Amino acid sequence: MNIRKSRSSTTALLTSLALLAALPLPGSAAASAGDGPVWVGRFDGGLAPWQEVRLNAKLKPNNFALRHWDGVAALEVQSAGSMSLLGRPVTVDMARTPVLCWRWRIDAPLKSADLTQRSGDDYAARLYVSLAIPDADKSLGLRTQLRIARSIWGPSVPDAAVNYVWDNRQPVGTERPNAYTDRTMMVVLRSGAADAGGWVQERRNVGSDVARLFGASATPVQLAITADTDNTGETARAGFADLHWVPEQAACEKR
């Protein structure tokens, strides 16, 4: 599955959101939220309903593989001057299970990436949460922008997105708009090489992040994971495992 970033000036406003446009909308394959945990990525029994999506056939895709990595059932992503995503639809109740847990790892951070520049919008590891926002909470300008984007990319272009990234230079805790569009907010969870080379556990209150960045009515509809090197031409290897939603007061599941 491969998704590519267009650099066309006519679509730059929502370029990073359009990377997820080819994913199916939430349906029977999506995870249903309960009191938790709600598993969305075990990677020990096949990929479904995760899918590979490619928007630009000219852009080199990443390589994705299921593997056991240091005893962990995981998805491995290898990226070499390439960009593609593995994504899936989700339906999750933010009032019940707002916290997303996962493990990830990288071999090393990128060297020349710079999230403040379009030319440097690459990451050793990247997790997308795409959002839907009720029409009543969208400005006329935003509705117009989304209508144009969907006329180009299709009806599943999301309203907004939060990206959790393993960066190479910005400090942990950095939050700023994506270099292509302010409808995607970048959140730096790891930075540099300090935690590289092994599995790192993350526990993030996505509900809180989404409400703060895009309003309380925004809800997750898609997840995607990747390593991203198409702009810098570098190489990266990342792993993802054990993605699941839990209640705010609950611990992440151990496997």
Label the model's feature ranges:
Residues 122, 126, 132-180:
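Extracellular/luminal beta-rich ligand-recognition
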Residues 64-85:
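Short carbohydrate-recognition loop motifs
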Residues 2-16:
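Bacterial N-terminal signal peptides that target proteins for export
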Residues 89-100, 193-196, 216:
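Extracellular/lumenal carbohydrate-interaction signature centered on repeated Trp-anchored short motifs
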Residues 127, 182-192, 196-234:
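Extracellular beta-strand ligand-recognition surfaces/modules
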Residues 12-26:
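Bacterial N-terminal signal peptides
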Residues 43, 223, 241-245:
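Extracellular beta-strand elements of beta-rich domains used
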Residues 31-57, 140-147, 255:
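Extracellular carbohydrate-recognition regions
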